Amino acid sequence: VLKVASYNIRKGLGTDRLRRPDRILDVLNEVDADIIALQEADRRFGKRHSALPLDMITAHSDYEPVPFETRPDSLGHHGNAILVRRGITILAHDILHLPALEPRGAVVADIRAKGQELRIVGMHLDLSGFRRRQQVRSVLAQINDRAPDMPSILMGDLNEWSRKGGCLGEFIGGHHDAHTGPSFHSQRPMARLDRIFVSHKIKILSAGTHQSLKARRASDHLPVWAELSFS
């Protein structure tokens, strides 16, 4: 069984307006996933330092970041990052450039975990519905160009308020939705903005949102997770 999760950490800023990366790491340790896609993991302005300092990740968790190395002291690309549990092999990684007017993007990592090679995509999509559909098509086209038969897990903040429409329709036919439940707003979750999709070779065993007291305070989103097996 492989557990994956996605979490928009809002640059470490909690619902109490306190910026506490230690609290984000506590929540990640509570979720205890093998692979985590993060959104808003870097500050947006200035040098765009990571909202989760690298030395803090090393000292207080069992994770290491996929080294996208877009900027010194940044964790990812436009705030998109992937953490993997130590012992998981990172085979390849890259940035996916998306059509966007605002700073949005996606990242991809090919990994080997528990004897299985997988492709992991983390993404944070646009506020515009038209642009979101373009971005999902772009992500799917780019990963299909990279060995379409590799089992794939796509995770992130899709910013899609529709329950079934909008950009979600772009996944139909190629991917299954892990029904994780509403993740936004963390104080009173009503919208499924954060999603996990898997390709056909992956079986979804269970899925949900992580709703601990600390998670409700650490960000305005709750983490979503799924436990998976491979056929």
Description of each model-found segment:
Residues D55-I57:
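A short, gly/pro- and small-residue-rich
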Residues V1-I35, R43, A59-H60, E64-S231:
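Active-site regions of metal-assisted phosphoester/phosphodiester hydrolases
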Residues F45-A51:
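Short, flexible/disordered intra-domain loops and linkers
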